A protein has these predicted regions:
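Loop/turn-rich, solvent-exposed surfaces of beta-rich toroidal or solenoidal domains
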Residues: 286-324, 345, 362-363
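Beta-propeller blade signature
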Residues: 43-63, 102-120, 124-144, 187-226, ...
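Cullin-RING E3 adaptor/co-adaptor recruitment helices
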Residues: 1, 34, 349-440
Length: 440
């Protein structure tokens, strides 16, 4: 399925590092970045953050895209954030704008919620003064508008990006990421919980040192009470990391990758006892280590992993399944070998399909003795493609067969009940669009 079905909007849909979720078989997409189209920036392959005042919806039955505008008090540019959907509400926390990293949360919600307070009493000195508000917009309404929100209790996590989130019992459970702490915060943090990568300093009155690095912290935001908390975890925690992938199965949060390991590691956090478990696997049976990939739950015991940036510096196109009961990886054959992806999204759709959207197809990073070499221009994608993870029902097979062979049934379609006819015609639109793409 190609995003070009949105009339004249194809290039505007190209993006990476966005957030996405599926509601009523409609894919919602917000944020991310793409290659700048300004003449002076095109040659250098400079990326720009996409508009924050719009959200895109794709009807997965017909393949048709629709843009909704979110007006009001629009947030500033934001990348590297973490988005999550709770009861049809999109929450966005952290990330980085043109000024630096953020520890402010933004939510899309219809009710007024409060502004998050930071744990640092001198935040204007510690971190650049940006993204200090929370915002809300009810995306289920025909007209959406950003609204500033106020007052949350508890201690807000330090600024970060490239973190992950599990949604469990209307709570947002964040893990890891890359960000900034004051030297005082670092002194009060276990050395195994924050790895300092570099330091900088600012002088406003007194000299203040800031430490930049990776963490393995767990922070919880309760959406019902608007309260932050930091549970004490037990067991062997993952090493500090970012750009990893997370997924939820029952009461357990799983994460993989994001660390510089030759094989893809996988951990589990029990969200009731807050106990970590690491899966010890034979290296010969595990996928290549990677980051910026996706991990999607497809059953009560299976996790589907796709793509990412390999430890070898190349964008990957492989698909794997991890069975949490047997504790084993299985490499999957699939029809999308021509679609390597990094910084994409992968959502669970109807019939346990994995719906992949966007991302970059050619990110390549290699290190030599002097510098880091990066692919000059990224190819940000706009297509939606689907992985089938189980046999379809007879109804789904018939629906798709009629949609893909509409000429055979052209005279009979009007005989169907109106609701069924409407659904079949959406499938006709979908397969007609596919034929146009294949013959273009």
């Amino acid at each position: 399925m190609d995003a070009g079905r949105a009339d004249g909007a194809g290039s505007r849909l190209e993006r990476s590092s966005h957030t996405a979720f599926i509601r009523n078989n409609t894919l919602f997409v917000w944020g991310g970045y793409q290659v700048s189209r300004l003449p002076e920036q095109v040659e250098a392959g400079q990326d720009v953050v996409l508009p924050r005042d719009e959200i895109w919806l794709c009807d997965l039955d017909s393949g048709m895209w629709q843009q909704k505008t979110i007006s009001g008090d629009v947030p500033s540019d934001l990348s590297g954030f973490c988005g999550a959907n709770v009861n049809d509400t999109l929450y966005v926390f952290g990330g980085c704008d043109s000024a630096g990293y953020s520890n402010q949360e933004r939510r899309i919600i219809s009710d007024l919620v409060s502004c998050l307070q930071t744990s640092c009493t001198n935040q204007d000195v510690c971190f650049p003064p940006f993204l200090k508000k929370m915002f809300s917009a009810d995306v289920s309404q025909p007209c959406c508008s950003w609204t500033r929100l106020t007052d949350a209790k508890g201690t807000t996590p330090s600024p970060r990006n490239e973190h992950s989130c599990w949604v469990h019992r209307e709570r947002l459970i964040y893990f890891g990421g890359y960000g900034c702490k004051t030297i005082g915060e670092v002194r009060n943090t276990l050395s195994s919980s924050f790895i300092v990568e570099e330091m900088s300093w600012a002088t406003i009155g007194d000299t203040l040192f800031r430490c930049w690095g990776w963490n393995n912290e767990v922070h919880v935001f309760d959406t019902r009470s608007s309260t932050w908390s930091k549970p004490e975890t037990q067991g062997p925690a993952p090493a500090p990391r970012g750009s990893h992938a997370g997924a939820l199965l029952g009461n357990k949060g799983y994460l993989s990758g994001g660390a510089e390991t030759a094989e893809l590691d996988i951990f589990c956090l029990d969200l009731e006892s807050w106990t970590w478990t690491q899966f010890d696997l034979l290296p010969s049976c595990a996928p290549l280590g990677r980051s910026m990939h996706t991990m999607t739950p497809t059953s009560d015991s299976n996790l589907f992993v796709y793509g990412g940036l390999g430890i070898d510096g190349n964008t990957l196109n492989d698909a794997w399944q991890f069975n949490t009961r047997r504790r084993e990886w299985v490499k999957l054959t699939h029809p999308h070998k021509d679609k390597p992806r990094v910084c994409h999204t992968a959502c669970l759709g109807k019939d346990d399909d994995v719906v992949v959207f966007g991302g970059s197809s050619n990110l390549c990073i290699h290190m030599d003795l002097v510098s880091v070499l990066r692919s000059p221009v990224q190819n940000h994608c706009r297509d939606v493609f689907i992985f089938q993870t189980r046999p379809y029902s007879l109804y789904r097979l018939c629906e798709d067969f009629i949609g893909g062979n509409s000429e055979l049934f052209r005279l009979q379609l009007d005989w169907l009940p109106s609701k069924l006819c409407s659904k079949i015609r959406k499938r006709v639109e979908f397969f007609s669009a596919m034929k146009l793409v294949l013959t273009a």
